[in-house]
Regions:
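N-terminal, positively charged/glycine-rich alpha-helical extensions of SAM-dependent methyltransferases
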Residues: 1-26
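Conserved alpha-helix/loop element of class I SAM-dependent methyltransferases that forms part
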Residues: 32-52
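A glycine-biased structural micro-motif
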Residues: 53, 115-116
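Conserved class I S-adenosyl-L-methionine
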Residues: 54-62
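Class I SAM-dependent methyltransferase SAM/SAH-binding core
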Residues: 65-108
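S-adenosyl-L-methionine-dependent methyltransferase catalytic module, highlighting the catalytic core
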Residues: 106-111, 117, 121-122, 130-220
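Short, compositionally biased P/S/T/A/G/V-rich stretches that sit at domain boundaries
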Residues: 221-244, 325-346
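Immunoglobulin-like IPT/TIG beta-sandwich domains and homologous Ig-like subdomains
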Residues: 242-318, 347-420, 424-425
Length: 426
């Protein structure tokens, strides 16, 4: 498919050397984009005039007009680009700017490297990327409130079918650094899929789409309905409460709402205050509902509260999950063991072994607790929640074990405990 025609800026860029026009002390620089055009583009987003006390990140800063405008409004501004632009450094010096300048690829960006920002500008970058969705996930992780995205689009209606063109060798405007051309629906879907709670199309003009992407749900309206009861939260595939921010992981939660008629459009889960759009919402037996959603990008290591709102309700009670937490047990000890069906103390006659273990870490789950019998790994199927001094752990044998006495070990992190069990039959 032939890409839509794009203006040829090459002659003007070659003549001026600047992409952004600049008003510097005692000097006006004419770039490809006029100051009026950039002000018009920025005005399509709800950027406050007063940004004092806020950190703002400008990704794809180029010559820096948007960076310096954020600083002019009072923000602590940081600019990022994939190459060291001498024109940015020149303008920063002339303006006496204190903006930080970071040369890095968008895929290298992380909260650990840059910190977190109230607002992120992501203008004119997406179509230069081979992996636009991955980039949006990286950008989402950096923002605590909002990311404003401006990108080339191939057209299409916002509610149409998402589609994207791939430009292998300069098909878009003759530039070999233009790789992708999403249509408007695809751009919005990318933003939602990257982990933003809300995505709002602000404008489409001259094949440029402007999307405001928010990390949080709006606050409940006055007179919001009764809060649902959050029953359980677990890893979508592992079933435990431990999650890794370095992976593309998903959360399942079960809740009991006060009303009915729920869908993906009116269920609002959140983790650590960051909203995440449900990928699945369905009713289960007994009046409970289940929602599956992406773990929000950029969570700090530690415990995070999960809540859910449903059908315009207030927020539910909170349950906690662990993100990037190592299992750090106390002094592990096996306080008792028994057959998991017959409950014969000290003996195993079936396929399930029940143990009572002291010293397990609070974030112990089936993924980070290991049980072995005679050196063979058992499948951990259940761990009792924290509360009792000794927590029950159920593990299933992988196959037949001859009668006799065997050593059983339980390990969490670098700690391990052992006991003996008598296998009567298998």
């Amino acid at each position: 498919m032939k890409a839509p025609a794009v203006p040829d800026w090459s002659a003007k860029l070659a003549r001026t050397g600047w992409w952004h026009s600049m008003e510097l002390p005692g000097e006006s620089i004419e770039g490809v984009r006029s100051v009026a055009e950039m002000r018009e583009s920025l005005a399509r987003f709800p950027v406050p005039e007063d940004l004092r006390g806020m950190r703002v990140l400008d990704i794809g800063a180029w010559d820096g007009w948007f960076t310096f405008e954020m600083e002019r409004r009072g923000a602590r501004a940081t600019a990022v680009d994939c190459w060291d632009n001498p024109r940015f450094r020149y303008a920063r010096e002339r303006l006496g700017s204190g903006a930080e300048y970071v040369v890095a690829d968008v895929y290298e960006l992380s909260p650990e490297r840059l910190g977190r920002f109230d607002l992120v500008l992501f203008f004119g970058v997406l179509y230069h990327l081979k992996h636009p969705l991955l980039a949006l996930e990286r950008v989402c992780a950096l923002a605590t409130e909002a990311v404003f995205v401006e990108s080339w689009v191939t057209g299409g209606k916002p509610g149409g079918r998402p589609a994207m063109e791939f430009y292998e060798a300069g098909e878009l405007g003759g530039q070999t650094d233009n790789w992708t051309g999403p249509n408007t629906a695809c751009l919005l879907a990318f933003c939602r899929g990257a982990g933003f709670a809300r995505v709002e199309l602000r404008a489409v003009k001259d094949s440029r789409a402007h999307a405001a992407c928010y990390r949080r749900w709006p606050p409940p309206e006055a007179g919001a309905g009764p809060a649902p009861e959050l029953l359980k939260v677990a890893h979508n595939t592992g079933g435990g409460l431990n999650f890794s921010s370095r992976r593309d992981e998903y959360v399942s939660c079960w809740f009991r709402p006060a009303g009915a008629g729920l869908s993906r459009e009116n269920v609002q889960p959140e983790v650590g205050g960051f909203g995440s759009r449900p990928l699945y919402v369905g009713r289960k037996e007994g009046g409970a509902w289940q929602a599956n959603f992406k773990l929000p990008p950029g969570l700090t290591p530690g415990w995070h509260e999960v809540r859910v709102r449903a059908g315009g309700s207030a927020a539910s009670n909170a349950l906690r999950i662990a993100v990037d937490l190592a299992a750090e047990p106390g002094d592990l000890a096996i306080a008792g063991l028994a057959d998991g069906v017959a409950w014969t103390p000290g003996a195993l006659s079936g396929d399930v072994l029940a143990l009572w273990v002291r010293g397990l870490p609070e974030n112990a789950d089936c993924a980070n607790v290991r049980v072995r019998l005679a050196g063979r790994e058992l499948a951990v199927e259940y761990i009792a929640p924290p509360g009792d001094e000794a927590r029950q752990v159920n593990a299933r044998l992988p196959g037949p074990v001859p009668p006799g006495g065997y050593e059983v070990t339980v390990a969490a992190g670098r700690a391990e405990a052992a006991a003996m069990v008598s296998v009567c039959r298998s």
